[in-house]
């Protein structure tokens, strides 16, 4: 209210000058039941009209509440309008600017606890209905069976939910199983499991397996022929090493502390120096 008073003071300085003494006697006049706001409004309405007072004000009126608006009267007017238009129990379904059907809300509600979703096709399918009016003026609808069957036939393929698994299954179902002349069933439609058949007993698999065995056998024989001289050479080298250089490697009774060659008394100096056997020193 302080903002409202400040705006009124700026707009009408002459009126407020006459009421300068009101501020000094605010407390006394409040006790008497007369407020400063009432004084200001009376002074403005006495000298200047409301239209002239708000002539130069373009930003609207700063007010708290509404002028000339009574909630009780407004509700009564709304009730009168509803009575004139008709009963409020009728439900109007409007699609593309045209009323399709008028049904009682109790008999056929749009959204109820049982119906969790609203289907647009159900309203479109009810375009062709047989309407019967009773003495109360309410309209009863009776759908023809042919129209309902056609509408359901159009709606059924649209209600199906397609997933990636179903798309893959459809691609698989297009090609029949050539080896067993059977087509696997879709589990989503018939509730049966899909069985994938292997191609083990086919002629092609036998031919491929025979060729594979032949290739393996030929490779193994060639490798054996190539590796035989190498094996023989390795065996010969091992025998030579055991006999000539390390004769006591395979001996079970030989110990690590024992010396492999014990020199004789006659040739101690030569054997200790050369560590080799000499024919003249052998006893």
UniProtKB/Swiss-Prot annotation:
The keyword Nucleotidyltransferase does not apply. GO terms for biological process: morphogenesis of a branching structure; phyllotactic patterning. A motif (IGT motif) lies at residues 60-66. Signal peptide: none annotated. Keywords: Growth regulation. Disruption phenotype: Erect inflorescence stem growth. The keyword Calcium does not apply. Expressed in shoots, vasculature, endodermis, petioles, shoot apical meristem, inflorescence stems, pedicels, styles and anther filaments. Belongs to the TAC family. Involved in the regulation of inflorescence branch growth angle. Promotes horizontal inflorescence branch growth. This is Protein TILLER ANGLE CONTROL 1. It comes from Arabidopsis thaliana.
């Amino acid at each position: 209210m302080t903002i409202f008073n400040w705006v009124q003071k700026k707009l009408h300085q002459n009126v407020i000058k006459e009421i300068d003494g009101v501020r000094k006697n605010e407390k006394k006049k409040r006790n008497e039941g007369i407020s400063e706001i009432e004084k200001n409004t009376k002074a403005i309405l006495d000298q200047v009209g409301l239209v002239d007072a708000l002539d130069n004000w373009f930003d609207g009126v700063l007010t708290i509440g509404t002028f000339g608006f009574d909630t009780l009267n407004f509700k009564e007017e709304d009730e009168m309008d509803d009575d004139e238009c008709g009963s409020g129990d009728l439900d109007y379904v409007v699609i593309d600017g045209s009323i399709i059907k008028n049904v009682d809300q109790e008999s056929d509600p749009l959204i109820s606890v049982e119906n969790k979703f609203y289907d647009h096709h159900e309203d479109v399918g009810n375009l062709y209905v047989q309407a019967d009016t009773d003495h109360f003026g309410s309209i009863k609808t009776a759908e023809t069976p042919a129209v309902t069957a056609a509408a359901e036939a159009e709606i059924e393929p649209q209600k199906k939910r397609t997933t990636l698994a179903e798309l893959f299954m459809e691609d698989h179902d297009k090609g029949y199983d050539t080896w067993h002349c059977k087509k696997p069933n879709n589990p989503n439609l018939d509730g049966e499991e899909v069985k994938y058949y292997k191609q083990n007993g086919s002629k092609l698999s036998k031919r491929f397996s025979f060729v594979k065995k032949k290739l393996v056998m030929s490779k193994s024989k060639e490798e054996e022929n190539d590796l035989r001289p190498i094996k023989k050479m390795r065996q010969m080298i091992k025998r030579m090493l055991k006999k000539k250089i390390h004769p006591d490697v395979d001996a079970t009774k030989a110990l690590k502390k024992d010396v492999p060659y014990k020199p004789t008394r006659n040739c101690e100096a030569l054997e200790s120096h050369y560590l080799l056997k000499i024919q003249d020193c052998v006893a």
